[in-house]
Amino acid sequence: MSSGFEFQLASYTTMPVTLLETLYSMRKKIFSDRLEWKVRVSHAFEFDEYDNAATTYLVGSWNGVPLAGLRLINTCDPYMLEGPFRSFFDCPAPKNAAMAESSRFFVDTARARSLGILHAPLTEMLLFSMHNHAALSGLQSIITVVSKAMARIVRKSGWEHHVLSTGEASPGETVLLLEMPVTADNHQRLLGNIALRQPVTDDLLRWPIALGVSGSAPQACMHSAA
């Protein structure tokens, strides 16, 4: 029996317009309104130059109601670590065909609470879906810029990672550059933690369900050194 949860994958060019607009609207509510990040907002939407044809999106929903999302960009393409995040760290931004950057990761806990499903392992399911997609796409790792609190959440979910660098987004605001390896062990730990709170179904094992061709898989990379 279905749990009502579904995680879907689509590229910028193949995602249905209504779903893309919903995603941008949720990002505006979470990153601009709630967290007060200095992000680009236009009307009711949050989006920037990294929302483009090179971008892949993951969206999690319950009974058709979107609750969570993230975006992935292969590091062969322009991505945030070599753009707005470049001043945070001393290390160079990797250019590696087998590595993608995750950004705009969110779970709408307020919406989940209103639906009575806050107990569900939404963060773990979103991470599991990203790991599944990365493994099936031939990616070896995901990099991401996070707070210390988010790094702890990622590790608690079961995804072991390495801290490539520590920096500051602003005075006193520490951020970490994580490399999250795509491995069988991480897959099993993520799945095991989900199983503690949510039945593991055949549908879950197949997440994310592809809505179109993604753009974060390995490709020819002009600079392949990490």
From Swiss-Prot:
Cited Pfam families: Autoind_synth
GO BP annotation list: quorum sensing; signal transduction
Coiled coil: none
InterPro entries (alphabetical): Acyl_CoA_acyltransferase, Autoind_synth_CS, Autoind_synthase
Alphabetically ordered keywords of this record: Autoinducer synthesis, Quorum sensing, S-adenosyl-L-methionine, Transferase
EC number per UniProt: 2.3.1.184
Catalytic activity: a fatty acyl-[ACP] + S-adenosyl-L-methionine = an N-acyl-L-homoserine lactone + S-methyl-5'-thioadenosine + holo-[ACP] + H(+)
GO molecular function: N-acyl homoserine lactone synthase activity
PANTHER family: ACYL-HOMOSERINE-LACTONE SYNTHASE, ISOVALERYL-HOMOSERINE LACTONE SYNTHASE
Family assignment from sequence similarity: Belongs to the autoinducer synthase family.
Function comment: Required for the synthesis of OHHL (N-(3-oxohexanoyl)-L-homoserine lactone), an autoinducer molecule.
Name of this chain's protein: Acyl-homoserine-lactone synthase
Originating organism: Pseudomonas amygdali pv. tabaci
